Amino acid sequence: MQRSFTEILDTFTAAVAAGNGAKFSALFTEDGVYDDVFYGEYHGREAIAQMLEGRFHRDGENFIWRMFNPVDNGATGYARWLFSYDCKLPHIKGKRIFMDGVGLFALRDGLIFRYEDAARTGELIAQLEIPGKKQTRVVGKMLDKQMANPDWAEHRK
């Protein structure tokens, strides 16, 4: 029996909060992709589980991720989200970090084939107190990725 999109979202956010890479990655197809705005793309269940346990939970704790107003048509799903965590980065250890965005889900056979965020990254960069030159590098990588997307071709004239 396939899960509903709402059930996928509930399991997704609970697994993130618990740091349960196996449960999280099981929501994805074998060749699934998690495209994180900061950590980049992770391909396949093993890499996705490692991203959650080895990146998210290395750099943060006490995660809360809530999804709102989900919509889907069986092949594509969207949900607005609010996300927060206590930062473990040494220069701001313990600081509560807040994010706001939309999750974009490509679905196949009741599983996530591709997940990516459309997040308000400016506010996040400010909260993380990323130094100026590093900010330029981080945002530059985001821009490079955006401009490499063929969907932007007509806009690059």
Each predicted region: which residue ranges?
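A solvent-exposed, acidic/Ser-Thr-rich amphipathic alpha-helical stretch
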Residues: 21-25, 29-75
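Aromatic side chains
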Residues: 12, 28, 34, 39, ...
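A beta-strand edge to alpha-helix "cap/lid" segment located at domain peripheries
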Residues: 4, 56-157
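Short, low-complexity N-terminal intrinsically disordered segments enriched in polar/charged residues
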Residues: 1-30, 136, 145-157
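A generic structural signal for ordered secondary structure
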Residues: 9, 28, 51, 97-105
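Glycine-centered flexibility sites
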Residues: 19, 44, 101-103
